[in-house]
A protein has these predicted regions:
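Secretory targeting signals
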Residues: 70, 120-179
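Long, hydrophobic alpha-helical segments
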Residues: 72-95, 192
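Transmembrane helix boundary and interhelical loop/hinge segments in multi-pass membrane proteins
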Residues: 89-109
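Terminal transmembrane helical anchor/hairpin motif
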Residues: 9, 26-69, 180, 193-263
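Aromatic- and glycine-rich beta-strand/loop motifs that create alpha-glucan
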Residues: 1-21
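A structural motif at transmembrane helix-loop-helix junctions in multipass membrane proteins
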Residues: 164-196, 204
Length: 263
């Protein structure tokens, strides 16, 4: 069953990977010409116009835009978090539900396979695909940055790991939500909404101090990129919270799926 599931999801994984790497390839091809011209000075001057809170939200107050690595630490990781977050959310909402949507659940029910086993195999495929996307993007960025110029390797490796934390929570959240419906069309919009709202909450909590508490309702807070940039270390608390939330949502998914009336 694992091979069947992995083969079924490989095409979408490949498409997401190619598109993601293509976006960053364009950046690495274009950025040398940008930093070699007067555009850098214009960008630096433009940065002075923005309020400190806005710069802080995108880490532009602690990362210079005069290099590809500086861009990656600021605007670049916005793309990284959103792309991987959207992929994880969509995968979580579809991977378990597609059997009902495609009317193949009857075939699985005819096999001597427990529902818990079905969930375990699908979750394993999801975790492998998400981890591979994070890993491949990290390797690609490493090659791109090596060609572009000097950068802090340890800091980069830690930064490359951080998108995995919100992605796992988003995956398990959308997986759990999918156990309440029978159609993938319903969960697709919900999963994308969760990802975007989660990112907006995290951004607002950084920009405005009165709503700083909103970060506790966002999965992207778990990435804690600013902490990695400043201290060159991953906050252990974020790792613990990610594990606890993922396990809790996983167990709830199994419980709900075993009770669900499959159609």
């Amino acid at each position: 069953m694992f091979k069947r599931e992995y083969k079924f999801n490989f095409k979408s994984f490949l498409i997401w990977t190619v598109i993601t790497l293509g976006i960053f390839l364009l950046v690495y091809l274009m950025y040398p010409s940008i930093v070699a011209s007067d555009n850098v000075k214009m960008i630096d001057e433009m940065m002075k116009v923005f309020p400190p809170e806005m710069l802080k939200a995108f880490n532009m107050d602690i990362a210079s835009m005069n290099s590809a690595y500086g861009w990656l630490k600021s605007e670049g990781f916005v793309f990284v978090l959103l792309i991987i977050g959207c992929y994880a959310g969509i995968l979580g909402s579809n991977i378990l539900l597609k059997e009902e949507n495609d009317k193949t659940i009857e075939y699985l029910n005819s096999l001597p396979i427990k529902r818990t086993t079905i969930v375990l195999n699908k979750v394993l495929v999801g975790l492998i695909n998400i981890t591979l996307l994070v890993l491949l993007l990290g390797i690609f960025n490493y090659i791109g940055l090596t060609i572009s110029g000097d950068f802090d390797i340890k800091q980069f490796i830690l930064l490359s790991i951080t998108p995995l934390f919100p992605a796992l929570v988003l995956f398990f959240t959308c997986l759990f939500i999918s156990t309440f419906t029978h159609k993938t069309k319903k969960t697709l919009g919900i999963s994308l909404g969760i990802v975007l709202i989660s990112y907006i909450l995290q951004t607002l909590s950084t920009i405005a101090e009165p709503v700083e508490f909103l970060k506790y309702f966002s999965a992207f807070t778990l990435a804690d990129i600013r902490h990695v940039i400043v201290d060159v270390s991953i906050n252990p608390l974020m790792v613990i919270i990610t594990i606890l939330l993922s396990i809790s949502l996983f167990l709830l998914t199994i419980f709900n799926y075993n009770k669900k009336e499959l159609v």
